[in-house]
């Protein structure tokens, strides 16, 4: 049963997430794994991946060293199994309700508990939960996970769908798959299948934590704070609380901040799910500001539900109060595209980010801290989470909240049409709802964007000529269903105050100057167009959401993956760490325009770094000079997922390139 309870609260602040109950037991130790039904069991790390567990056990060599990547493509063709034997903690064993929570499984996984089927998963971008109240033993429990090959499962899904899809970034040939690009048929990080800056290392495994949780009669499931109107004078807010209980009972709801009770009201619950709506107002709120505009003020609140004076459920939340919107308004020059924070138009100084590692569980909290502080210290105020990676860890968004970094959040779709059969749409719907609910309380979240470059691809990348009319029409239909219907409907339902952008870019195309007057632009003229950097002075869009130029990482990074015998642009190892087909040629060609091309490899690497920094500073300063016509400059890209020749300003080991230093100057 569902019951809606409306509480009028006199004063309250705002929220983002951490709870006291339920009781939690982490299940991260004493795992073992092996290839399915083959060989002996080996120790495993959880969270982890099959690849990293094989590395840790000495079964394979470092995939990042020299050209080892090509020697381990067999891993993604096999099934793998993980097993844990555990006992339930005494305190948790006494709870009435118990569930297993899998925060991230990559990707196709069949789960049993004590021999009983529990779940079959098909999406790495969401949490999976299972009620295990009647399945747990008071002695030893056996949790077993079988990960199906993402390649073989992808082939099955492709055959069921019955239509080919481009997925040009899927390095299927490198993986021994010929033309079979299966990445689009699994809800799995696209970049794992390869990109023009990344290797093909298609992982499986428990990539986020698993835990057992238990509670008795009452559990606060979620708290969401909507901010219908926030001004320096007053913030009108609305808190929505979802809780489950077994009983019809009267409770006292209290809202606290700094141990002070801000609101107190009686709540009458019914068995099942209950929803509480709490409207409230704050006078003269301390507003949240982006980096460079002011302080990123945050409030921490606690909601307590009490029975007979005792706290029976609690949820603590932190967020900031602000008005943040994307302004798209027709003007005499076309249509504006800028972010407005607390009534102030903001020039977005920022960058596109990819995942910090191919092997996601390797990314630590300190890695995220360095990522966000490096952006803030370079005077940035925005990071775009690009649609070919992952929805980032909660801690990343918490850091952006603290440092005043606005987040442009893509849904995880990039550079290719996608299926739109009912089963696929169901997976996408569940993924979207989960991540919208998970992230919507973050003050830093500026907007949702449906995809990266798919509409541009449909219009300009030759798919219409390459494919039969009926297949191309299916691609158009799939785009319409996913990005014009399903995703905007979910944003409207679960995060109604946030702007949804269909795709990036939508109107503008770097080869068509007449289109730059509307929307955001990805200008790849200085790379794929092989134009000089000076063209950035005149090719000015309303908002530059991608532009870039490659460089080598510095020599100390190259030494981690190559030996001196490999120090040649045409060596097999250097080519293995250069995923752009024109990359090394174009770096050398452009260097010859602006500088003398050194003969010594180490000098060539150094001058490549100088070249990248010079060219990209040229673009950033041109965008800022053309304010307010142009209101954003987002570099491609911030970081790397392995040691590689790429467009990044910070290499895999965290070293700033010349471009990042030039960014700090250009954005000052």
Residue ranges and their predicted role:
Residues 19-101, 180-209, 213-218, 235, ...:
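Extended carbohydrate-recognition surfaces in non-catalytic/accessory domains of CAZymes
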Residues 93-96, 136-140, 282-298:
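Short glycine/proline/serine/threonine-rich loop/turn segments at secondary-structure transition edges
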């Amino acid at each position: 049963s569902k019951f809606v309870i409306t509480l009028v609260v006199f004063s309250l602040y705002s929220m983002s997430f951490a709870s006291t109950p339920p009781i939690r037991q982490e299940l991260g130790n004493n795992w073992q794994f092996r290839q399915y039904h083959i060989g002996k069991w080996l120790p495993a790390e959880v969270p982890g991946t099959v690849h990293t567990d094989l590395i840790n056990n000495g079964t394979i060599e470092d995939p990042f060293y020299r050209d080892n990547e090509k020697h381990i493509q067999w891993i993604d063709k096999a099934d793998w199994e993980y097993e844990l034997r555990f006992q339930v903690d005494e305190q948790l064993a006494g709870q009435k309700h118990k569930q297993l929570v899998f925060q991230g499984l990559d990707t196709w996984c069949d789960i049993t508990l004590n021999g009983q089927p529990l779940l079959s998963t098909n999406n790495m971008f969401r949490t999976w939960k299972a009620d295990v109240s009647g399945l747990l033993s008071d002695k030893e429990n056996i949790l077993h996970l079988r990960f199906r090959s993402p390649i073989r499962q992808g082939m099955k899904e492709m055959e069921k769908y019955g239509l080919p899809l481009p997925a040009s970034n899927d390095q299927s040939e490198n993986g021994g798959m010929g033309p079979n690009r299966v990445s689009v048929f699994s809800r799995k990080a696209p970049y794992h299948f390869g990109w023009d800056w990344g290797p093909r290392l298609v992982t499986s495994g428990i990539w986020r934590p698993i835990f057992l949780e238990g509670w008795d009669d009452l559990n606060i499931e979620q708290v969401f704070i909507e901010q219908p109107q926030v001004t320096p004078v007053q913030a009108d807010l609305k808190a929505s609380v979802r809780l489950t209980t077994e009983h019809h009972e009267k409770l006292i709801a209290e809202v606290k901040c700094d141990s002070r009770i801000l609101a107190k009201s009686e709540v009458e619950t019914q068995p099942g799910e209950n929803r509480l709506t709490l409207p409230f107002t704050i006078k003269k709120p301390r507003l949240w500001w982006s980096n460079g505009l002011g302080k990123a003020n945050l409030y921490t609140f606690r909601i307590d539900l009490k029975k007979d004076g005792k706290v029976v459920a609690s949820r603590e939340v932190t967020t900031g109060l602000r008005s943040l919107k994307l302004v798209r308004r027709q003007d005499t020059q076309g249509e504006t595209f800028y972010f407005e924070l607390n009534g102030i138009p903001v020039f977005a100084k920022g960058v596109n980010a990819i995942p910090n590692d191919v092997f996601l569980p390797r990314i630590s909290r300190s890695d995220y801290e360095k990522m966000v502080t490096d952006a803030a210290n370079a005077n940035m105020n925005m990071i775009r989470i690009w649609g070919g990676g992952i929805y980032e860890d909660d801690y990343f968004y918490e850091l952006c909240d603290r440092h005043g970094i606005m987040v442009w959040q893509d849904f995880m779709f990039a550079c290719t049409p996608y299926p739109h059969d009912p089963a696929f749409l169901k997976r996408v719907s569940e993924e979207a709802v989960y991540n919208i609910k998970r992230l919507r309380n973050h003050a830093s979240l500026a907007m949702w964007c449906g995809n990266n470059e798919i509409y541009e691809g449909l219009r300009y990348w030759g798919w219409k000529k390459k494919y039969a009319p009926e297949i191309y029409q299916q691609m158009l239909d799939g785009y319409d269903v996913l990005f014009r219907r399903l995703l905007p409907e979910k944003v409207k339902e679960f995060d109604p105050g946030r702007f949804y952008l269909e795709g990036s870019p939508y109107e503008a195309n770097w080869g068509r100057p007449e289109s730059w007057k509307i929307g955001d632009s990805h200008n790849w003229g200085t790379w794929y167009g092989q134009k000089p950097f000076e063209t950035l002075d005149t090719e000015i869009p309303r908002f530059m959401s991608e532009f870039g130029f490659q460089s080598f990482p510095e020599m100390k990074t190259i030494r981690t993956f190559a030996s001196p015998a490999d120090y040649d642009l045409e060596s097999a190892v250097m080519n293995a760490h250069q995923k752009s087909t024109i990359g090394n040629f174009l770096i050398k060609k452009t260097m010859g325009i602006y500088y003398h091309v050194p003969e010594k490899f180490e000098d060539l690497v150094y001058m490549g770094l100088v070249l990248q920094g010079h060219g990209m500073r040229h673009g950033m300063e041109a965008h800022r000079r053309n304010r307010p016509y142009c209101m954003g400059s987002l570099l491609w890209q911030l970081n790397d997922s392995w040691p590689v020749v790429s467009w990044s300003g910070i290499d895999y080991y965290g070293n700033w390139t010349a471009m990042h230093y030039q960014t700090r100057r250009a954005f000052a």
